[in-house]
Amino acid sequence: MKFTNLTAKEFGAFTDSMPYSHFTQTVGHYELKLAEGYETHLVGIKNNNNEVIAACLLTAVPVMKVFKYFYSNRGPVIDYENQELVHFFFNELSKYVKKHRCLYLHIDPYLPYQYLNHDGEITGNAGNDWFFDKMSNLGFEHTGFHKGFDPVLQIRYHSVLDLKDKTADDIIKNMDGLRKRNTKKVKKNGVKVRFLSEEELPIFRSFMEDTSESKAFADRDDKFYYNRLKYYKDRVLVPLAYINFDEYIKELNEERDILNKDLNKALKDIEKRPENKKAHNKRDNLQQQLDANEQKIEEGKRLQEEHGNELPISAGFFFINPFEVVYYAGGTSNAFRHFAGSYAVQWEMINYALNHGIDRYNFYGVSGKFTEDAEDAGVVKFKKGYNAEIIEYVGDFIKPINKPVYAAYTALKKVKDRIF
């Protein structure tokens, strides 16, 4: 085995072939970091047949003028079951970054630690406890099992829906009642989905602005989304849910005809048997449905007049690779939330994964707090409704490469933090 630099082609071919390959360990992310001006390294291990068997994208940032901080975002991509390979990789990686004036090395591997349900109950161990001892022996310090959302650290908990050997019907059957109803609702209510182009990205951004204001969370800036759409190319999809009013109103009119027919039948049943309580209840129920139907038709016509035949209502931002579809961000128009557009977006992308043979649908980050007063309690409930599971990752590891200078650096940083 040998530790070596990799070409972008070698790196991309390998990472696309591996499980637990994160979107930040892709050629698209490499090209993005180059464009942003970062010092970027593609490294890995090749076996005796010159085949890549491990790969890692590293970025380097200047620290204290003469040193660098090296970071691998969710790397490396490697067979973690091969402990000998893991040892060799990190040992050689430390030697490599030392040659490049590294002060310290930071990694947060895409490696599961344990599995939980959405109530925070542990359901299984991923079998990677050995990794903590291994990294300690190699000189890495674990930063702890942090929870919540951090502006610097990657989120440690993902909500993931397993699609392996499942059909669309299987997915719906496993949803809770609300998710089932809303998914079926958007399928029949004229809600359509198409993908936005780069020029149309402001539509998505306006929804994110609506959502961040109503839910009080900090969103990324425009540049974050535009750059990833540009450099990730077809590895980013931005689905838009919208109402086609011609189809929506047509479907409502057809529904009204059926309801009127059923109502007339119920009225005739009452004429024949006035004492039939069941027929009276049926009449009342059908009348309520008709009233609701009429309100929807009136609303549809009014909105069509105000907004034209197509009304955007929700959009999402997704990363795609052969391992998983990642729901990174999404927003909905507050004024039209009742159309349940976000459910149309989710259903479109779940089916995208199924149709492209991708076995994992990642709803992405949750805080890991699992309490009613957690900042993401509503989001956790939403993701739980799809029958997803929680994966907790091993977390962050830091290795001081130049120990004396790193000790001085951390001491100065603590003093600075206390002052400010």
UniProtKB/Swiss-Prot annotation:
Its EC number is 2.3.2.17. One of its GO terms (biological process) is cell wall organization. It is found in: Cytoplasm. Keywords: Acyltransferase, Cell shape, Cell wall biogenesis/degradation, Cytoplasm, Peptidoglycan synthesis, Transferase. Homodimer. Interacts with FemB. Since cross-linking between the peptide strands is critical for maintaining stability of the cell wall, FemA is a potential target for the development of new antibacterial agents. Catalyzes the formation of the pentaglycine interpeptide bridge, which is characteristic of the S.aureus peptidoglycan. Adds glycines 2 and 3 of the pentaglycine bridge, using glycyl-tRNA(Gly) as donor. Belongs to the FemABX family. This is Aminoacyltransferase FemA. It comes from Staphylococcus aureus.
